[in-house]
């Protein structure tokens, strides 16, 4: 039995509201309290009074003063705000078009129902800078004896930080590891920019289901290719090092005539070797923890000795071990640094096997 516990899906642990009983996007928005609207507004600059400067306040141009500061309109500068509570969300460009929460997701209504997709969770980051809705797809793929379920994560940002995104998200069932669905991160998404034509570009739910089914087939082929690639423990140790070390650190490690022994000394946290290579204790702890998860993680014994097992050591570390929680965990796994490392790990698993 593994000493590790599963941390659940990226959107677990108090994030969002469960919406599995909802049929339409409108019901989802209402139940998750996301049924508010966003508008665009002009911005003003706050500047202190200047003894030698222009302190004239021209109210006809929208200027005003307050507590020792002058406020003037910023030309061609815009922000977004929630209309229900008048809370600012972010700064956006002139051509940015607001896409309301309901408009971003209601196209998927015809794909929800029995033998179709099911809404799972809906919620927000911050006060609404980004909102998300997840849906479980009626598509399960097999990797050897492993089952991998497939989800879609819809997100809509209101702070100008990202497009409307539809992210394909495979989850390994036994351990709830989040996996990457493609070698290129960009191939894991359908992206729609906040422009005049955004709503027209949103496809029907039936089209998204067809795209998801095709995507799941290619993902299954990708994972099964990893499953038949053999890797020894020494090769996995090297793989995890190559994933985490910088090029400079790799070069210093290569200076050892007996690299294999030097690698084992690193994994034993030998101070002299770590100092020579220039690797920090924090980074070495991450490397060792990844290898320990490879050896004893949830569902790892069944896939040890393969590139599939090596890759899942990395995804399992970020899904179940790394010190991430709540909104920070979800953001990192789906969109941020953890996702980027896991994507590099997927590519490296193939490169190391060649």
Label the predicted regions.
Residues 1-59, 123, 140-354:
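Intrinsically disordered, low-complexity regions enriched in serine/threonine
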Residues 55-75:
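An N-terminal amphipathic alpha-helical segment
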Residues 69-95:
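A short, surface-exposed helix-loop junction/capping segment
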Residues 84, 113, 158-160:
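Short, solvent-exposed coil/turn segments at beta-strand boundaries
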Residues 91, 130-134, 257-260, 270:
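Long, C-terminal folded domains that constitute the functional core of proteins
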Residues 94-118:
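Amphipathic alpha-helical segments
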Residues 99-107, 126, 130-132, 149:
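Short, well-structured alpha-helical interface segments that form or flank functional binding sites
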Residues 120-140:
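Beta-rich nucleic-acid/ligand-interaction surfaces
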